[in-house]
């Protein structure tokens, strides 16, 4: 590319000659005393391809040298830093900022249209005071809650660290502690954050950092209005002892007519009832997760109807003050239903198995005195004497479970061992 002022390839009247760059606090560094080099028409802008003044500096000790990447005209059009291309107000990528402000800036990308657009914007910048952005961004006056939650308010100086030493990754670095690069394990090459393009970041398309922040914003808690359209009450918790009913009225009156304000000092909460559902929805949207009264952050939720609160308490086992009750240990389970009237006579309350008549056990008694005992089996005639049922006092109560129940146990009959 020809860089002489006499060449007609580019409009040399629009070459940039600046005295100081447009930088964010992170890129500038934490050291207030820095030495910065200035190279007039050193490189061409990576967006508009026009030569501009390049600044180079070191943001701190053990940090890498940084330089400006885009011209000041492109920086002012998007209100971004000339080095990192992040928004100067929120510290966020352009794609996240545009999504939060709900607008899309369609800048031309062809060479001729881009040059014409840049010249018109430079004319608009020269007619302004230079304190506010121009173009579509200057017309966006409303702020977004998502941007306030995702905004990076403090500098992150670790972003200025040196790059990873490629020789150390291969195990060939011989500098040791004198190596100006980092000796750390590199990130996964398949990680989307490892592949970033400066043009994609400037135009707000296919930015992996912006996609990560937008996914985080989508998972943030939200306060959805209840399905019951009759609910117009908001719950405000965490009042403390310093916030009064007047303070709450002074904040919520801007959203609509307030019907009642009930402050419960014991629970340090309040219930604000609006006259219309629309006013309650606007108040909930504007106050959720960002209500601060007298230096105290308050919690805002939708109120619930009495029927819904009663059902939830019965289901969860909670008291009126919100204390969850623990189950009492050792209590029996649910009792079975009582038996019918005709089954009461035969009801088995102890779940015992049905028992039949008591078993009869034939016990061989010793012969009376003076009578010889019968011969052992096999030595005498086989005689069968039918025996009648034993008397009631000789019947066994049932099967034997313990040794002491055995009638043949030694010592069970005193007459067996007595002499005749």
UniProtKB/Swiss-Prot annotation:
Modification N-acetylalanine, positions: 2
Q: Where is the composition biased (Basic and acidic residues)?
A: 309-318
UniProt-listed PROSITE patterns? RRM, ZF_C3H1
Lineage: superkingdom:
Eukaryota
Q: Which residues carry this modification: N6-acetyllysine?
A: 212
A GO BP entry: positive regulation of protein import into nucleus
Report residues of the Glycyl lysine isopeptide (Lys-Gly) (interchain with G-Cter in SUMO2) crosslink.
139, 149, 290
Report if keyword Metal-binding is assigned: yes
Residues recorded with modification Phosphoserine: 4, 102
By its UniProt entry, which SMART domains does this protein fall under? RRM (SM00360), ZnF_C3H1 (SM00356)
Which compartment or compartments is the protein found in? Nucleus; Cytoplasm
| Keywords for the protein's UniProt record, in alphabetical order | Acetylation, Cytoplasm, Isopeptide bond, Metal-binding, mRNA processing, mRNA splicing, Nucleus, Phosphoprotein, RNA-binding, Spliceosome, Transport, Ubl conjugation, Zinc, Zinc-finger
List the C3H1-type ZnF regions, as residue ranges.
159-186
Q: What does this protein do?
A: Required for pre-mRNA splicing as component of the activated spliceosome. Involved in the first step of pre-mRNA splicing. Binds directly to the internal stem-loop (ISL) domain of the U6 snRNA and to the pre-mRNA intron near the 5' splice site during the activation and catalytic phases of the spliceosome cycle. Involved in both translocations of the nuclear SLU7 to the cytoplasm and the cytosolic calcium-binding protein PDCD6 to the nucleus upon cellular stress responses.
> Could you describe the subunit structure of this protein?
Component of the pre-catalytic and catalytic spliceosome complexes. Component of the postcatalytic spliceosome P complex. Interacts with PDCD6; the interaction induces translocation of PDCD6 in the cytoplasm. Interacts with PPIL1.
Q: Which family does it belong to?
A: Belongs to the SLT11 family.
The name under which this protein is listed is Pre-mRNA-splicing factor RBM22
Q: Which gene encodes it?
A: Rbm22
């Amino acid at each position: 590319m020809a860089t002489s002022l006499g060449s007609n390839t580019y409009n040399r009247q629009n070459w940039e000659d600046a005295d100081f760059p447009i930088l964010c606090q992170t890129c500038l560094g934490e050291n207030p005393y820095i030495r910065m080099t200035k190279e007039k028409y050193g490189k061409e802008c990576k967006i508009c391809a026009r030569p501009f003044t390049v600044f180079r500096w070191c943001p701190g000790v053990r940090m890498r040298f940084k330089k400006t990447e885009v011209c000041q005209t492109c920086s002012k059009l998007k209100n971004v830093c000339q080095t990192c291309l992040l928004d100067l107000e929120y510290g966020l990528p352009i794609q996240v900022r545009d999504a939060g402000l709900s607008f899309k800036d369609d800048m031309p990308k062809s060479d001729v249209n881009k040059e014409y657009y840049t010249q018109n914007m430079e004319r608009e910048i020269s007619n302004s005071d230079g304190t506010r952005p121009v173009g579509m961004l200057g017309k966006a006056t409303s702020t977004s809650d998502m941007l306030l939650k995702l905004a990076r308010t403090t500098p992150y100086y670790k972003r200025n660290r040196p790059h990873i030493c490629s020789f150390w990754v291969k195990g060939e670095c011989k500098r040791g502690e004198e190596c100006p690069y980092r000796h750390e394990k590199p990130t996964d090459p398949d990680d989307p954050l490892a592949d970033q393009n400066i043009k994609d970041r400037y135009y707000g398309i296919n930015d992996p950092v912006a996609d990560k922040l937008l996914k985080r914003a989508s998972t943030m808690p939200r306060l959805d209005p209840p399905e019951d359209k009759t609910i117009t009450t908001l719950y405000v918790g965490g009042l403390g002892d310093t916030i009064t009913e007047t303070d709450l009225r002074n904040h919520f009156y801007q959203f609509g007519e307030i019907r009642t304000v009930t402050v419960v000092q014991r629970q340090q909460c309040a219930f604000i009832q609006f006259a219309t559902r629309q006013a309650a929805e606007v108040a909930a949207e504007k106050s959720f997760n960002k209500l601060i009264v007298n230096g105290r952050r308050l919690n805002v939720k939708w109120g619930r109807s009495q029927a819904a609160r009663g059902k939830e308490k019965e289901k969860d086992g909670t008291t009126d003050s919100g204390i969850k009750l623990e189950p009492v240990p050792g209590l029996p389970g649910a009792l079975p239903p009582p038996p019918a009237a005709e089954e009461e006579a035969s009801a088995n309350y102890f779940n015992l198995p049905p028992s039949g008549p008591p078993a009869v056990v034939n016990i061989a008694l010793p012969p009376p005195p003076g009578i010889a005992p019968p011969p052992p089996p096999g030595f005498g005639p086989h005689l069968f004497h039918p025996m009648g049922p034993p008397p009631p006092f000789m019947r066994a109560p049932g099967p034997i479970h313990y040794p002491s129940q055995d009638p043949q146990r030694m010592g069970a009959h005193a007459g067996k061992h007595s002499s005749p």
